[in-house]
Design a protein with these regions (language model features):
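Glycine-rich oxoanion-binding loops at beta->alpha junctions
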Residues: 66, 70-83, 269-287, 311-347, ...
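Short, membrane-interfacial amphipathic segments enriched in basic
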Residues: 630-643
Length: 668
């Protein structure tokens, strides 16, 4: 979900590149860079952090030239810093590359290229591409790119500069979007239309593995065999805001539609598709550790907590490991029982959730093995976990309500369960391989679920005036109901609650009256009859019932449903990955029908603010802070934070040491 721009024309490239990158900021990023070529010399400028940092560097050290490429990076390999920022070059600086996507075999290629004498300066998979192109280069960059494609496994959108072709820009794509903008005397490239729309509304869409060769006079497109094809330009009528949303009305809807791609990326990053096995090192726990574990404690907030509840079900089932799931804001205050031999897993989309971060440090203090699952490389939680961090590959989420981050977190819970199940001897490799094979089909099945959208929209328009909505389910469906209910109340402001279906008779059924809307999640075949009996209980009291079920349960569910949404069949442990999609769409369309601000619900923000027990992000005034730092450093205290003190003790922090810097340094 990084941003790519490219330009060749008569104007100074740096200004157009920076403008294009600014129009892709909504995608999220942690660093940015540009490369401009002039007279066969490629010059780079890169900066960590906001685009303004890069713009300031370019302003003080301009990059002259009328051809260039640019990139905003969302880290997937290597932490966010200037070195890992794109563009990347070969050793001689003759080839520059920007890249979106994930090269799955980059470690293998990196080893091969090192053996040939290539020297790497970054931790990224992208630098591998630059060295590979240099190694393969035979004087014809088009044929070089085509040969490189046969060696690259994974997804990529590439823009390439070649010092030996100073008036040509090359780009190609596979499983990652890339758009070419056409105009007289100038051509443009963007990973998304907003980067181009100020300059041209005529675009050429590249198919898989096609290569576009851009010159000032025009664009030529070749298939992966090297055959040129005729251009098929289209005209774009979107306004800029609509372009940022990819033509969708809201980011939330766009991100729901991005879920199949996010599922595919996360799966590919952790599973060897040829062997259909978890990649070695994908999960930071050895077989010896897995077999010695007593318990696993999962701690998270909000949507991530609900992913953890799914994790409890699948890990206990497949790995036979006791799992406790706790709300991060409560964890520290219940005097948790953890020690060596226990494992702690923190889940956070942003990697900055303060309560979750504080819980991690408490678990670390108690001696547990601490792991983390996050979507953001280099985040506070990722840094705290160190080598024990796992990543989802959902890409940035702009909408406040999490959708694709949740679905990839659930996917990771299933993958972790399989990995632990094999290592603990409760799953044979053949059974695990078959389950992974079925998981590989989930992105395609998720695309099929999107066909329910018109039915969801119609139903929402009829029921958007409801004041209360209840979700029920059993087992995994109960965990799913919790997230479905949160999503609805979060964006539509409808009072919604989720209940284990068997608990209705213990009080909740008193709230059911004529016209009450009840959504029953019915994916677990072995529990279907019991859940349907609860459905009949609420129907007999006047409820309107919506049922979400797989094809295999269609006939049984249809008898009791006022509305039925049917998803494709899959293994029972994988069905939550499909069933969540229609209820996310339901929350979205209910909110739209009620006129709510879908992307920015009232009173909510994307990442949680710091817990009150944590220190301020900012130190005192610079002069006072510097003076205080010198005194405190001499005294052996933290030079930037109020350590020691009652606030820190209450937060459960430990004193820093030379081998262990201040745990709280990220807040200063």
């Amino acid at each position: 979900m990084c941003g790519i721009v490219g330009y060749i024309g008569a104007q100074q490239a740096q200004d157009i590149l920076l403008d294009g990158l600014s129009r892709l900021e909504y995608r999220g990023y942690d660093s940015a860079g540009i490369a401009v070529m002039d007279g066969g010399v490629i010059r780079l400028s890169k900066a960590k952090g906001r685009l303004a940092n890069l713009a300031a560097r370019v302003a003080s050290n301009p990059l002259p030239g009328t051809i260039g490429i640019g990139h905003t990076r969302w880290a997937t390999h290597g932490e966010p810093n200037d070195i890992n920022a794109h563009p990347h070059t070969d050793m001689k600086g003759h080839i520059a590359v920007v890249h979106n996507g994930i090269i799955e075999n980059y470690e293998e290629l990196r080893a091969q290229l090192k053996a040939k004498g290539c020297v790497f300066v970054s931790e990224t998979d992208t630098e591998v591409i630059a060295h590979l192109l240099h190694t393969l280069y035979d004087g014809d960059m088009l044929s070089t790119i085509l040969r490189a494609q046969t060696m690259l496994e994974g997804s990529y959108a590439l823009c390439v500069l070649n010092a030996e072709a100073p008036d040509t820009l090359y780009c190609t794509r596979k499983d990652s979007p890339l758009v070419v903008g056409l105009s007289d005397g100038a051509q443009y490239v963007g990973s998304d239309i907003p980067a181009l729309i100020r300059h041209t509304r005529t675009v050429e869409l590249l198919d898989e593995r096609e290569v576009a060769v851009l010159t000032r006079s025009g664009v030529r497109v070749y298939d992966h065999f090297g055959n040129e094809r005729a251009l098929k330009p289209i005209h774009v009528d979107w306004d800029v805001e609509a372009a940022e949303k990819g033509g969708y009305a809201h980011f939330m809807l766009k991100e729901i539609h991005e879920e199949p791609a996010a599922l595919k990326k996360t799966f590919s990053a952790h599973v060897d598709a040829e062997k259909m096995a978890i990649r070695p090192g994908a999960f930071p726990i050895s077989a010896e550790e897995a077999n010695s574990l007593r318990t696993l404690t999962i701690v998270a907030c909000g949507t991530a907590y609900h992913a953890g509840v799914v994790g409890k079900y699948v890990i206990e089932k497949l790995a036979r490991l006791p799992v406790v799931v706790d709300v991060a804001s409560e964890f520290r205050y219940r005097n948790p029982i953890l020690s060596a031999g226990d494992c702690f897993l923190a889940i956070s989309q942003s990697g900055e959730t303060a309560d979750t971060l504080a819980a991690m440090r408490e678990a670390e203090r108690l001696g547990a093995k601490v792991m983390a699952l996050t979507n953001v490389v280099g985040s506070s939680i990722a840094r705290t976990a160190g080598d024990c961090v796992m990543y989802t590959y959902a890409g940035p989420e702009i909408a406040v309500a999490s959708t694709k981050a949740y679905i990839t977190q659930v996917e990771m819970m299933v993958l972790l369960a399989i990995d632990l199940g094999v290592k603990r001897g409760h799953l044979t490799e053949s059974v695990a391989s078959e389950l992974l094979r079925q998981m590989s089909d989930i992105p395609t099945l998720a695309e099929q679920v999107m066909a329910l959208e018109p039915a969801v929209q119609r139903f929402s328009s009829l029921y958007h005036d409801r004041q209360h909505v209840f979700y029920i389910g059993r087992g995994l469906d109960n965990a799913l109901a919790m997230e479905a209910s949160l999503k609805l109340k979060e964006v539509s402001y409808i009072m919604s609650e989720a209940y284990a279906a068997g608990e209705l008779k213990h009080g909740t059924i008193a709230l059911i009256e004529q016209g009450t809307l009840v959504c029953a999640l019915l994916t677990q075949e072995q529990l279907a009859d019991k859940t349907l009996s609860n459905v009949r209980e609420v129907k007999s009291r006047g409820a309107k019932v919506l049922i979400v079920c797989p094809e295999a349960l269609r006939d049984r569910a249809a008898k009791d449903a006022d509305e039925l949404w049917v998803i494709p069949d899959a293994a029972s442990d994988l069905l939550p990955l499909l069933a969540i999609i229609p209820v996310q769409l339901f929350a979205y369309y209910m909110a739209v029908s009620r006129g709510c601000d879908v992307d920015k619900p009232r009173n909510l923000a994307k990442s949680a603010s710091l817990a009150r027990s944590l220190p301020s992000r900012r130190c005192a005034t610079p002069k006072a802070a510097a003076s205080s730092a010198r005194r405190k450093k001499a005294a052996g205290a933290c030079p930037c934070c109020p350590w020691p003190g009652p606030t820190w003790a209450a937060a459960g922090a430990r004193p820093p040491s030379p081998s262990r810097p201040c745990l709280w340094r990220w807040y200063c």
